[in-house]
């Protein structure tokens, strides 16, 4: 069973997100649980929590179908102690908000060394940041997103994701989210079924499919191996339709949120319908 959706707006209240997802025919969704451009947010009230849970139940979304995303401000590998601590406090708050909402996943970008510390030191800081948050929460898995490798962002190589996981003490509460645009921009080819097989065979060997807890399905405006993060609508970019058809027809991607972050929300319903159709076509065949 594929859970397919998009990163929807929670404007007007978190309880609006499940309704917006249902409107576009989604069976999964992503959201921010707070304003992602601000460090601090007002605590969740019992009313907000209850309304969100009721809406999820109304529209038939379980925690396994929801992939919250943390603030882009957070850098869990920051080279400066004070800034690192600020990010760790904010990340813990994000994890606790998920815990309160009954959500079991939190997707985040791993971090950046800002050209100030060695890559290995940054990866170790990220792992320790995860350990700190896991020790103070229950039931929420920290889901590391691969990056395009733009600037000094780490997480663009499968080996870097594996290194972070290796440093996490509770392996049952760490996972990864593979963004197809980021992977392509980082040099992992997805343009043909054969390329997809090779790329994900490497992922399985280096990271392991047991850690795959979600995906972002995005085509790429950016060129292969460019280390530039530019999303595009499915089939409109440099990856093309084949990769997304291949993912829909591979059971290894069942049971996890498959989230669109493509550039035109007006066609998300069409993109979701197309993805569902690829799955049905495979089942019939």
Curated annotation (Swiss-Prot):
Enzyme class: hydrolase
Keywords: DNA damage, DNA repair, Endonuclease, Hydrolase, Metal-binding, Nuclease, Zinc
Chain sites annotated for binding Zn(2+) 2: 145, 179, 216, 261
Binding site for Zn(2+) 3: 182, 229, 231
A molecular function GO annotation: DNA-(apurinic or apyrimidinic site) endonuclease activity
UniProt cofactor note: Binds 3 Zn(2+) ions.
Catalytic reactions of this protein: Endonucleolytic cleavage to 5'-phosphooligonucleotide end-products
Required co-factors: Zn(2+)
EC number: 3.1.21.2
Pfam families per the UniProt record, alphabetical: AP_endonuc_2 (PF01261)
A GO BP entry: base-excision repair
UniProt superkingdom: Bacteria
Ligand binding (Zn(2+) 1): 69, 109, 145
Keyword DNA repair among record annotations: yes
Function noted in UniProt: Endonuclease IV plays a role in DNA repair. It cleaves phosphodiester bonds at apurinic or apyrimidinic (AP) sites, generating a 3'-hydroxyl group and a 5'-terminal sugar phosphate.
NCBIfam families for the chain: nfo, PRK01060.1-4
Stated family: Belongs to the AP endonuclease 2 family.
Official protein name in the record: Probable endonuclease 4
Organism: Salmonella schwarzengrund (strain CVM19633)
């Amino acid at each position: 069973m594929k859970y397919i959706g998009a990163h929807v707006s929670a404007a007007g209240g978190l309880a609006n997100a499940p309704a917006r997802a249902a409107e576009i025919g989604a069976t999964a969704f992503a959201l921010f649980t707070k304003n992602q451009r601000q460090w601090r947010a007002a605590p969740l009230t019992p009313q907000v929590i209850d309304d969100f849970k009721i809406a999820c139940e109304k529209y038939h979304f379980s925690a396994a179908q929801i992939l919250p995303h943390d603030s882009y401000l957070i850098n869990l590998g920051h080279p400066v102690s004070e800034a690192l601590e600020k990010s760790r406090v904010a990340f813990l708050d994000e994890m606790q908000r998920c815990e309160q909402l009954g959500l079991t996943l939190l997707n985040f970008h791993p971090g950046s060394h800002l050209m100030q510390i060695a890559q290995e030191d940054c990866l170790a800081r990220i792992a320790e940041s995860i350990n700190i948050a896991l020790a103070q929460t229950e039931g929420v898995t920290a889901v590391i997103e691969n990056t395009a490798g733009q600037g000094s962002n780490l997480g663009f190589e499968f080996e870097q994701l594996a290194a972070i996981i290796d440093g996490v003490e509770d392996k049952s509460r760490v996972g990864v989210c593979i963004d197809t645009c980021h992977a392509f921009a980082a040099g992992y080819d997805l343009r043909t079924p054969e390329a997809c097989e090779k790329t994900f065979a490497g992922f399985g060997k280096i990271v392991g499919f047991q850690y795959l807890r979600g995906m972002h399905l995005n085509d790429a405006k950016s060129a292969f191996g460019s280390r530039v993060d530019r999303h595009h609508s499915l089939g409109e970019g440099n990856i093309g339709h084949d990769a997304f058809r291949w993912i829909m027809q591979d059971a290894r991607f069942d049971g996890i949120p498959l989230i669109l972050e493509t550039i035109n929300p007006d066609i998300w319903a069409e993109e979701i319908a197309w993805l569902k159709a690829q799955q049905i076509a495979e089942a019939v065949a």
